[in-house]
């Protein structure tokens, strides 16, 4: 158990979680390597007083995904006292560039006690002509459910999650074409997928 920096009341809070009086709701904001050699920082050394980070867009979990490596714990990973089944992902078939989209994810609490789940939505553009991460976090929502209960998480994906920076135009742009929408528990656990078509507009 890693409580980060919980403050002066951290002991009581941690005890409540360990004894099952409270549901742990935190999710990892980083990726933890299974072996140190998989961490890019181990290959970064200053040269002549200059320190270059050459991962570009492929930082953190994006790098693990790009190189098909499995870390010890993915970005977004977290534990709880119940289990969940991801049942259905609903997305609009089409969205206009600049509009964003609303994603709905149906999940079922399959455990024996009430719980809280952080439903995460990622985007991917495998057919893109641009250098893109394998997938990136676009939004999330927390839901609570009793044992056996099915609930729907509604995640609003903002328009900026679909944009990229155009170096040539010095502006944010939205690439038209198919976009994969994935939903799951972490960057490496996304059991549901769907596709939305991004159509161009004059301003995007």
Regions found by a protein language model. Give the residues of each.
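Intrinsically disordered, low-complexity Pro/Gly/Ser/Thr-rich segments with frequent PxxP/GP/PP motifs
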Residues: 129-167
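Generic structural detector for well-ordered beta-strands
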Residues: 85, 90, 106, 139-146, ...
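Intrinsic-disorder/low-complexity, polar/charged segments enriched in Ser/Thr/Lys/Arg/Asp/Glu/Gln
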Residues: 100-102, 150-154, 191-193
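Short acidic, flexible loop segments centered on an aromatic residue
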Residues: 112-129, 135-137
């Amino acid at each position: 158990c890693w409580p980060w920096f919980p403050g002066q009341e951290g002991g009581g809070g941690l005890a409540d979680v360990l004894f099952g009086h409270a549901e742990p709701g935190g999710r990892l904001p980083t990726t933890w390597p299974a072996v140190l050699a998989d961490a890019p920082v181990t290959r970064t050394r200053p040269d002549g007083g200059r320190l270059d980070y050459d991962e570009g867009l492929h930082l953190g979990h994006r790098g693990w995904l790009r190189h098909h490596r499995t870390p010890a714990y993915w970005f977004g990973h977290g534990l709880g006292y119940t289990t969940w089944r991801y049942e259905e992902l609903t997305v609009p078939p089409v969205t206009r560039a600049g509009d964003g989209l609303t994603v709905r994810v149906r999940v079922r609490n399959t455990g024996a006690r009430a719980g809280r789940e952080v439903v995460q939505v990622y985007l991917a553009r495998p057919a893109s002509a641009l250098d893109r991460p394998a997938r990136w976090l676009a939004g999330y929502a927390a839901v609570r459910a009793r044992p056996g209960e099915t609930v729907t998480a509604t995640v609003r994906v903002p328009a900026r999650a679909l944009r990229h920076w155009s170096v040539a135009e010095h502006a944010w742009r939205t690439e038209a074409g198919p976009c994969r929408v994935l939903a799951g528990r972490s960057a490496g656990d996304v059991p549901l997928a769907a596709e939305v078509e991004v159509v161009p507009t004059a301003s995007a």
